[in-house]
Amino acid sequence: MPTVLALETSCDESAAAVLRLNNGCLQVIASRIASQVEKHAQWGGVVPEVASRLHVEALPHLVEEVLQEAGQSMARFDAVAATVTPGLAGALMVGSVTGRSLAALHALPFFGIHHLEGHLASVRLAEHPPRPPYLVLLVSGGHTELIRVGAESEMVRLGRSHDDAAGEAFDKVGRLLGLAYPGGPAIQALAATGDSGRFSLPKGRVSKPGGGFHPYDFSFSGLKTAMLRLVQALSEADEDLPRADLAASFEQVVADVLVERSLLCANDQGLKTVVMVGGVAANRRLRELMSKRGQEQGIEVHTAPLRYCTDNAAMIGAAALQRLVSGVNGSSLELGVAARWPLDKTEVLYHSPPPF
């Protein structure tokens, strides 16, 4: 039963987990997350230098806690994994150095994991995970992408956001409405009492140079601007700001756009399964709408378990175990970190010399 210790420090969540593969099923033996949300809330967003310092403070304790809970000594692991890209460089370095050091000290393979590959693997932590091929809507604070996942770790991006990710749009609109950071949960709570049809908002589209639109791509900057102008107009008219209706209308149009383009892409690709992963995949309205419209179109919808939608180390361990059992020997201990790296080039993370 292959077992890994996994670390995640790509942004503002410090996390450690122990995972085991038992008869083809992933088992999360222990998982711990130290959130930095309260620390960053006073600035309305993540401060990279603060995030790095908090990772340094939290990660050793998290590793100790998961080892104790798992009742596992380092000698009994088959590998150590850590996120190495993409993310905040300083934050990534904390997890990467910790992971590589533990691997070197205990003569274990080290797996440098692409953060998005971790999100894609998070659905494998569900009780009944889907089998590829399928289309993944990866929707989080930093990413909004449509990715076809096939056998043998095949990952092909078919759609993306050309500006803000959906999660960024939630945060920015949340600030506009005077809500707490992060914006996603705050907007969802407020929208529950609002009228989602009160305000008409644009579904941003991305033009092609030769005319027409990219059918599977996203743009949320126009929606964000429309919300700003709407709030300004209501304020200038001395109206009481209908924050619940504004939140509900915004949440609805985001969900509509994500669902419509995901299902269009799946149908065009001949795929009968759509998977949702990432922090925004925890949004209740999005989950319900995708399930309803997917059922209407004969498309099966799977979502990563709620506790594994936001950043966590269990998904990093899941990705590492996939690589380990497929015969990958691991990454070089000289592998560094990169703030950006394309998902379709993850294979080179396991080559020598390392790409960065």
Curated annotation (Swiss-Prot):
InterPro entries: ATPase_NBD, Gcp-like_dom, KAE1/TsaD, TsaD
Top-level taxonomic group: Bacteria
Compartment(s) where it occurs, according to its Swiss-Prot or TrEMBL record: Cytoplasm
EC number: 2.3.1.234
Top EC class, one word: transferase
Residues that coordinate or bind substrate: L138, V139, S140, G141, G142, D171, G184, N283
Family recorded in the similarity comment: Belongs to the KAE1 / TsaD family.
Protein name, UniProt field: tRNA N6-adenosine threonylcarbamoyltransferase
Species the sequence originates in: Prochlorococcus marinus (strain MIT 9313)
